[in-house]
Amino acid sequence: MSSLNSVLPSNACAEIIEGKDKVHNVVILMHGLGDSHKSFANMAKNVPLPNTSYISLRGPYRLPLDFENPGGNWMWGEDVHFDQNGELQSEADFSKSFTMISNLIGNLLSYGILSSRIFFFGFGQGAMVALYSCYKLSTKYQLGGIFSFGGTLPLSITLPNHPFHVPVYLFEKRLHCSCSEYEESRLRKTFKPFHLTCWNRDDKTDMPSSPREWYTFVQSISKHLYIHNTLFEDAIPLTSF
């Protein structure tokens, strides 16, 4: 297989962290509102997974605010909205982001990656776009799963009659601090199986902030990864061990 650089759509800006071994799994990283792909790329280098490559995407729109981020300030939606408290809202028009992700998925399939081995790891608005994209693509593909750190479904979407079979893992620093009970119920009606993990802390963000919390993520995604055993020719599930 050639380099994964060939799968990037022409309008995508991303950093690829390729696995050392043959790639069977791809994790698409999607940063939060006002961040960039650089921070998630650095994170991926510290969380290597067997037979897995990361693609850290950058949001297609520049945020018209300066947070002095070395990688710039980017967002996934075309417009910016503020709530009644003056806080930035995550929900926006994600049409351009969805087209980019849809093209990326198609290119990964052409590259030889199975749809069930394509995963999303997103924070905040990035997680919302990941959930939105999987909602729209699940009638066409069987995707591997979504790891959402504080991200919820856009309220504008109509829930399906039956949940899509896409594993969703939602992580929060404290129960319902980022995802209300109503938003959780919408996720449960849209995807299954659904798993909720609460870090039970008030500081920092919904992202993992300790080795124990990172282990929880690795343990969760490992249930769905495929690794290649050098003693055999076939790829086997990590859960077979």
Curated annotation (Swiss-Prot):
Keyword Hydrolase annotated: yes
One Gene Ontology molecular-function label: carboxylic ester hydrolase activity
Keyword annotations from UniProtKB, A to Z: Hydrolase
Alphabetized PANTHER family for the sequence: LYSOPHOSPHOLIPASE-RELATED, PHOSPHOLIPASE_CARBOXYLESTERASE SUPERFAMILY (AFU_ORTHOLOGUE AFUA_5G09340)
Superkingdom field: Eukaryota
Hydrolase recorded as keyword: yes
Family: Belongs to the AB hydrolase superfamily. AB hydrolase 2 family.
Protein name: Uncharacterized hydrolase C9G1.08c
The enzyme's E.C. designation: 3.1.-.-
GO cellular component labels: cytoplasm; cytosol; nucleus
Protein's organism: Schizosaccharomyces pombe (strain 972 / ATCC 24843) (Fission yeast)
